[in-house]
């Protein structure tokens, strides 16, 4: 039977529950245990697919096409295990399931209430499909005290009784702020947070306390006394230079040992930390550095590009270099001198996005990369704009644009109306719902033999994750290829362009999919490894 670890947060949001859960999972995995991570989000949206990146940050897409919380990206990167649609749930999805059951008559005329019906649905989600795992780590989104989180806290309280306390533990992540005027760390916010948690019937077994400096033993003992937690189970979680330092730091503080102790496990094998030691060594002892310019639309919130940032760093790890990211707002880029902003870059990357705002700035950056022979990687929207740039500036196609922006006589990029998902034909209309209506999840692509991208992958058949509603118009393929822009990858049915490249450019690749979603620190995605390698070569030329 799986053992359950519930991770809650208090005092303030954005403390890093997702990183804490992922780091603990990595430590348990390093001891040989099979671990599953799940995220429970209290918001009423069915999923984050239609939420603004400024509101939610990145939408992380799984192989089976689920649009999920960005924390699932951390889960995958730290454990190497691919998440799926059953690893993330929201209040909106819970209520939708319940209302569908009520309409079918499944409740046999009963009055549908938060307790037991909502809490039972939450418990069903938590406990289903865990037979092959030793530990299931569940992160509860939000902060203790939020009204939206109450049904989730009640559900995990009930599970503590139903599964027995030998199979359930609670970890509470809090903040211990330093007050400069007093010159000391304060325990009171954590005390009140634990009191709030205890008021709903949950007493934490372990306190994971965030702080920007070492916590004195006297303060740890104070937290132990007032929060009713063993002194050894008050674990300091100090700020780290990078998120990949966290597993080693938590192991040093004894988090994994305390978790096993709380479950009464005293015969666990020691963790094999060689992998993490190698990663942290590469991070802190680079043999050089390069600068990558990311020309994006949501640069005001870096969480909108969380997986991209990590994948770029992974490319640096593969090449033993530090990668500095130069963020360029594509909208401002339209008004300013593009040459000055990009002159110091050893590589240029245009990531995914939606809408016309900032698109012209990205097109200017793509033109700069093409003409100056600077390594370029265009992802999703970035590939589409690379095709528009080629159509305008090389093929001289008048009014070349995307139907996403405006009505145009030459739609180089257009709305997809149908595509194959396995053996099933999926269809969409322009006026349909936005939520869940894109080409989502893992799709196969076939690469041309001897193409640059096929050499990077070392194969001609690949499977990558997608999230897009628009696609490069296949009707313009011949015209663009005559100008040197090769469609080096296509969907298996030959209808949807998947990758492009220039034959006369040292490194210029566009992909319709999102390779950043499958990159891991210990297994960098080949595209990012090759892109950073090309940037290293470029740095030697300037």
From Swiss-Prot:
Its EC number is 6.3.4.2. PROSITE patterns: GATASE_TYPE_1. InterPro entries: Class_I_gatase-like, CTP_synthase, CTP_synthase_N, GATASE, GATase1_CTP_Synthase, P-loop_NTPase. The keyword Ion transport does not apply. It comes from the Bacteria. UTP binds at residues 13, 186-191, 222. CTP binds at residues 13, 146-148, 186-191, 222. Keywords: ATP-binding, Glutamine amidotransferase, Ligase, Magnesium, Metal-binding, Nucleotide-binding, Pyrimidine biosynthesis. L-glutamine binds at residues 54, 353, 381-384, 404, 469. Residues 1-265 are annotated as: Amidoligase domain. Gene3D superfamilies: 3.40.50.880, P-loop containing nucleotide triphosphate hydrolases. One of its GO terms (biological process) is pyrimidine nucleobase biosynthetic process. One of its GO terms (cellular component) is cytosol. The active site is at residues 380, 514, 516. Catalyzes the ATP-dependent amination of UTP to CTP with either L-glutamine or ammonia as the source of nitrogen. Regulates intracellular CTP levels through interactions with the four ribonucleotide triphosphates. This is CTP synthase. It comes from Bartonella tribocorum (strain CIP 105476 / IBS 506).
């Amino acid at each position: 039977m799986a053992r359950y670890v519930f991770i809650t947060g208090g005092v303030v949001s954005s403390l890093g529950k997702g990183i804490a859960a992922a780091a603990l999972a990595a430590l348990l995995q390093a001891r040989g245990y099979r671990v599953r991570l799940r995220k429970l989000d209290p918001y009423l949206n069915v999923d984050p697919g239609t939420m603004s990146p400024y509101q939610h940050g990145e939408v992380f897409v799984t192989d089976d096409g689920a649009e999920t919380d960005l924390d699932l990206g951390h889960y995958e990167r730290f454990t190497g295990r691919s998440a799926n649609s059953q690893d993330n749930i929201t209040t909106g999805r819970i209520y939708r399931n319940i209302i569908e059951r009520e309409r079918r008559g499944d409740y046999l005329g009963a009055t549908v209430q938060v307790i037991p019906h909502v809490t039972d649905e939450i418990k069903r989600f938590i406990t289903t499909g865990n037979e092959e795992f030793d530990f299931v780590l569940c992160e509860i989104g939000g902060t203790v005290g939020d009204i939206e989180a109450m049904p989730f806290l009640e559900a995990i309280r009930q599970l503590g009784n139903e599964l027995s306390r030998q199979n359930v533990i609670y970890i509470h992540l809090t903040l211990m702020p330093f007050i400069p005027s007093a010159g000391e760390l304060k325990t009171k916010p954590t005390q009140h947070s634990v009191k709030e948690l205890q008021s709903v019937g949950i007493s934490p077994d372990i306190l994971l306390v965030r702080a920007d400096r070492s916590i004195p033993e006297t303060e740890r003992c104070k937290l132990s006394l007032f929060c009713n937690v063993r002194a050894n189970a008050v674990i300091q979680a100090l700020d780290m230079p990078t998120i990949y330092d966290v597993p080693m730091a938590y192991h040093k503080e004894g988090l994994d040992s305390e978790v096993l102790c709380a479950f009464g496990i005293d015969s666990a094998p020691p963790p094999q930390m060689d992998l993490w030691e190698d990663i942290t060594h590469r991070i802190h002892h680079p043999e050089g550095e390069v600068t990558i310019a990311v020309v994006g639309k949501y640069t005001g919130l870096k969480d909108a590009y969380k997986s991209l940032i990590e994948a770029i760093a992974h490319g640096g790890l593969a090449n033993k270099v530090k990668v500095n990211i130069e963020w360029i707002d594509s909208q401002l880029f339209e008004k300013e001198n593009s040459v000055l902003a990009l002159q110091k870059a050893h590589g240029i990357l245009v990531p995914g996005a939606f809408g016309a705002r900032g698109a012209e700035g990205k097109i200017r950056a793509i033109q700069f990369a093409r003409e100056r022979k600077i390594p370029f990687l265009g992802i999703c929207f970035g590939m589409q704009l690379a095709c528009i740039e080629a159509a305008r500036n090389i093929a001289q196609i008048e009014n070349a644009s995307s139907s996403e922006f405006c009505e145009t006589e030459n739609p180089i990029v257009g709305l997809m109306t149908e595509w194959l998902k396995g053996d099933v034909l999926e269809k969409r209309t322009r006026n349909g719902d936005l939520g869940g209506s894109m080409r989502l999840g893992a799709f196969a692509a076939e690469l041309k033999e001897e193409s640059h991208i096929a050499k990077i992958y070392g194969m001609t058949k690949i499977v990558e994750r997608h999230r897009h509603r628009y696609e490069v118009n296949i009707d313009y393929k011949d015209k663009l290829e005559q100008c040197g822009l090769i469609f080096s990858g296509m969907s298996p049915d030959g209808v949807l362009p998947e990758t492009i490249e220039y034959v006369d450019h040292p490194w210029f690749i566009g992909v319709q999919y999102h390779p950043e979603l499958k990159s891991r620190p210990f297994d960098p995605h080949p595209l990012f490894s090759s892109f950073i390698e090309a940037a290293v070569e470029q740095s030697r030329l300037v």
